[in-house]
């Protein structure tokens, strides 16, 4: 139980820090409009899966954002090392969060059902 609490707490802290780093430190225009929605940590805190959304729905913008985040991983890890009191900063993997689009799709289906 305590280990799960720790991974959740570290994940929330990484989420907050990565959002701040993307806004203030990363100058790559490909990551403009990217918001971190969730961070899932491995139990031993060695890896973090970082879920993000982007304002644009265009596939090309999604691919550019993914590429920009992958290129900025070193900068993000370095800044996390300065800001977090951890022995080892976890490896970061960026994954597009599809849950918001899925939720919007379900909302639209419900609205369509109401109209009938």
UniProtKB/Swiss-Prot annotation:
It is found in: Cytoplasm. Signal peptide: none annotated. SUPFAM superfamilies: Ribosome-binding factor A, RbfA. InterPro entries: KH_dom-like_a/b, RbfA, RbfA_dom_sf, Ribosome-bd_factorA_CS. GO terms for molecular function: ribosomal small subunit binding. It comes from the Bacteria. One of its GO terms (biological process) is maturation of SSU-rRNA. Its main location: cytoplasm. It holds the Pfam family RBFA. Keywords: Cytoplasm, Ribosome biogenesis. GO terms for cellular component: cytosol. One of several proteins that assist in the late maturation steps of the functional core of the 30S ribosomal subunit. Associates with free 30S ribosomal subunits (but not with 30S subunits that are part of 70S ribosomes or polysomes). Required for efficient processing of 16S rRNA. May interact with the 5'-terminal helix region of 16S rRNA. Monomer. Binds 30S ribosomal subunits, but not 50S ribosomal subunits or 70S ribosomes. Belongs to the RbfA family. PANTHER family: RIBOSOME-BINDING FACTOR A, CHLOROPLASTIC-RELATED. This is Ribosome-binding factor A. It comes from Streptococcus sanguinis (strain SK36).
């Amino acid at each position: 139980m305590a280990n799960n609490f720790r991974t959740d707490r570290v994940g929330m802290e990484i989420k907050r820090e990565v959002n701040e780093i993307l806004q203030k430190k990363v100058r790559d225009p490909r990551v403009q409009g990217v918001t971190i929605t969730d961070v899932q940590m491995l139990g031993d805190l060695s890896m973090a899966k970082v879920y993000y959304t982007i304002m644009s729905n265009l596939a090309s913008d999604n691919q550019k954002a993914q590429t920009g985040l992958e290129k900025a991983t070193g900068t993000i890890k370095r800044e996390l090392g300065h800001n977090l009191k951890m022995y080892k900063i976890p490896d970061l993997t960026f994954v597009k969060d599809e849950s918001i689009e899925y939720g919007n799709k379900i909302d639209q289906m419900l609205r369509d059902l109401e109209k009938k």
